[in-house]
């Protein structure tokens, strides 16, 4: 038996026993081909299978399937004899809810949004002309080469580029990305780009890691998230300070080309000239108005008016000073009279004597023979005995 004979027998066997069946699972990869045919992988917790839905059948589907969609397909299993590869040929398709990846993504997105990690108030502004730029990505990736090539094409030589190598796919990618982010955030960069080229939903899922999202939120450096293609959204896009649809778009957003800078300088020069001309016109108008004023108001007359104003001010000041002096004199007289009254009372009270018996002030009628008393004046005191 030849490979062709075996494949043909297997094809007949599969198409006989697996005809008109229902298949449910989550899309993990998909290609919407230019021919109109759809090619995708459907997976469950442990396995995946290649699927195809040809143009004649998918025209009846009312939506465009995407990675993460959980689908219910009707169709049959077939085998391609030339390669021996078997696949599921779908004749109908409908959504059956969300797949595991999509459900995890939406749940985390909702929770972080409630915590405020996506709040625009916390977004940091991107620098106008960055001088120190960090890029976190795989150092062997095509995305990095595209970004560096675009920077060179723009002839933007103001910035120094720092590359931080990190995994951008797989279970270990979140930890690798976090370590690179911490290192970059300590280097006082002007801005930081987290980048990865396109891939399946599973390939990009490391950028939906909660710990990575929290590190991005805590970072003091402004961060651009540039993951996948324009249709791809990950958690890092929402928590970063700016989302670029692609890595190349991040460069376009951040860097001006030499031509852009020249045009910007020309525009600034034009605005400065307009402002300068406006100022000159204002000063010319002011001089014209002043010349008209002095023409109708001679200088001696203006000086006389100013002298009269100064005389009036002098009179007002003299009047205020005189009133203040009279007020101070009256206040001084009152204080002097009060002092004299207190002084007279003090002199008279020197002759007064206070009698105390048993520590209390006593009247003469309260005293008896042999009582011991204390006689006190302002200057001395004596003990005495009543006869």
UniProtKB/Swiss-Prot annotation:
GO terms for biological process: DNA catabolic process. Its main location: cytoplasm. Its EC number is 3.1.11.6. It is an enzyme of class 3 (hydrolase). The keyword Hydrolase applies. It is found in: Cytoplasm. GO terms for cellular component: cytoplasm; exodeoxyribonuclease VII complex. It holds the Pfam family tRNA_anti_2. Keywords: Cytoplasm, Exonuclease, Hydrolase, Nuclease. It comes from the Bacteria. GO terms for molecular function: exodeoxyribonuclease VII activity; nucleic acid binding. It catalyses: Exonucleolytic cleavage in either 5'- to 3'- or 3'- to 5'-direction to yield nucleoside 5'-phosphates. InterPro entries: Exonuc_VII_L, Exonuc_VII_lsu_C, OB-fold_nuc-bd_dom. PANTHER family: EXODEOXYRIBONUCLEASE 7 LARGE SUBUNIT. Bidirectionally degrades single-stranded DNA into large acid-insoluble oligonucleotides, which are then degraded further into small acid-soluble oligonucleotides. Belongs to the XseA family. Heterooligomer composed of large and small subunits. This is Exodeoxyribonuclease 7 large subunit.
């Amino acid at each position: 038996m030849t490979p062709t004979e075996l494949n043909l027998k297997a094809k007949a066997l599969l198409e006989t026993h697996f005809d008109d069946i229902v298949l449910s699972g989550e899309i993990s990869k998909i290609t919407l081909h230019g021919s109109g045919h759809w090619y995708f992988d459907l997976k469950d917790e442990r396995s995946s299978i290649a699927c195809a839905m040809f143009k004649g059948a998918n025209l009846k589907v009312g939506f465009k399937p995407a990675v993460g969609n959980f689908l219910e397909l009707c169709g049959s299993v077939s085998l391609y004899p030339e390669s021996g590869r078997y696949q599921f040929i779908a004749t109908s398709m409908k959504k059956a809810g969300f797949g595991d990846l999509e459900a995890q993504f939406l749940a985390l997105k909702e929770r972080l949004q409630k915590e405020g990690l996506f709040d625009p108030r916390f977004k940091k502004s991107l620098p106008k002309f960055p001088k120190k730029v960090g890029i976190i990505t795989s150092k062997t990736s095509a995305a990095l080469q595209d970004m560096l090539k675009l920077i060179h094409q723009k002839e933007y030589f103001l910035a120094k580029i720092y590359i931080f190598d990190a995994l951008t796919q797989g279970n270990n990618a979140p930890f690798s990305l976090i370590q690179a982010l911490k290192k970059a955030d300590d280097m006082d960069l002007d801005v930081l780009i987290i980048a990865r080229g396109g891939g399946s939903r599973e390939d990009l899922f490391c950028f939906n890691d909660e710990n990575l999202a929290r590190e991005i939120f805590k970072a003091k450096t402004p961060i651009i998230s540039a993951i996948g293609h324009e249709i791809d959204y990950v958690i890092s896009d929402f928590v970063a300070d700016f989302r670029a649809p692609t890595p190349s778009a991040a460069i376009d957003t951040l860097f001006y080309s030499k031509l852009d800078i020249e045009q910007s300088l020309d525009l600034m020069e034009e605005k400065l000239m307009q402002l300068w001309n406006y100022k000159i016109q204002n000063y010319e108008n002011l001089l014209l108005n002043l010349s008209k004023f002095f023409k109708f108001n001679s200088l001696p007359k203006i000086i006389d008016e100013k002298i009269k104003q100064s005389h009036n001010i002098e009179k007002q000041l003299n009047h205020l000073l005189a009133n203040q002096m009279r007020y101070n004199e009256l206040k001084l007289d009152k204080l002097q009279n009060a002092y004299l009254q207190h002084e007279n009372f003090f002199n008279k009270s020197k002759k007064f004597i206070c009698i105390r018996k048993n520590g209390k002030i006593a009247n003469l009628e309260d005293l008896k023979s042999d009582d011991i008393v204390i006689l006190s004046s302002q200057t001395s005191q004596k003990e005495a005995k009543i006869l």
